[in-house]
């Protein structure tokens, strides 16, 4: 409700100070984390967190550097997949009764990091394929931010019509909609995918 950015900054500092005093007086060990501003929008949102096994949020926290963020907005510092020096041609492998990354890794005797997992979401009534490493999961809050909201996972009964495959066999090859790949796949090649 401030009339200027300077006033907003001052109000923010006063609220921050008040919260810190409350937590200090309660004797709570707390930390401030970057957070999603949610439906209100905007930037620079922060939350005060107290470590607890009975909370509703999960926080990424680094004791050595002090970085802390709600997992909805946490930035990954995990290395990308290393590129093989020689790119192989695309080829098909029959994987009968294989319906998950774990089953695929067991069947092919490979590591999850060699797999590119696909998930299909619907954005404004159009399919979008999300491609990530086999051991990763989609962060739907970040996906909504990238796509601009109005996003939902495709229903199981929609998958065959959209991709021609069942949930455990979907891949990017031949997919006709938009594809969004995780940054960790930036230079990856020779991956196994549905």
Residue ranges and their predicted role:
Residues 1-194:
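Extended, low-hydrophobicity, polar/charged segments
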């Amino acid at each position: 409700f401030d009339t200027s950015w300077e006033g907003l900054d001052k109000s923010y500092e006063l609220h921050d100070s008040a919260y810190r005093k409350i937590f200090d007086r309660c004797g709570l060990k707390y930390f401030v984390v970057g957070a999603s501003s949610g439906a209100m929008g905007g930037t620079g949102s922060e939350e005060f967190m107290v470590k607890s096994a009975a909370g509703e949020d999960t926080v990424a926290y680094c004791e050595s550097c002090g970085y802390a963020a709600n997992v909805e907005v946490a930035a990954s510092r995990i290395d990308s997949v290393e590129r093989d020096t020689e790119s192989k041609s695309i080829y098909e492998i029959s994987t009968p009764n294989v319906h998950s990354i774990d089953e695929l890794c067991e069947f092919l005797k490979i590591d999850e990091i060699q797999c590119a997992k696909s998930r299909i979401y619907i954005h404004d009534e159009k399919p979008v394929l999300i491609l990530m490493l086999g051991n990763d999961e989609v962060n739907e809050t970040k996906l909504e931010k990238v796509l601009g909201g109005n996003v939902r996972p495709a229903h199981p009964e929609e998958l065959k019509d959209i991709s021609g495959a069942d949930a455990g066999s979907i891949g990017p090859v031949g997919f006709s909609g938009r594809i969004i790949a995780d940054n960790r796949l930036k230079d990856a090649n020779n991956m196994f995918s549905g």
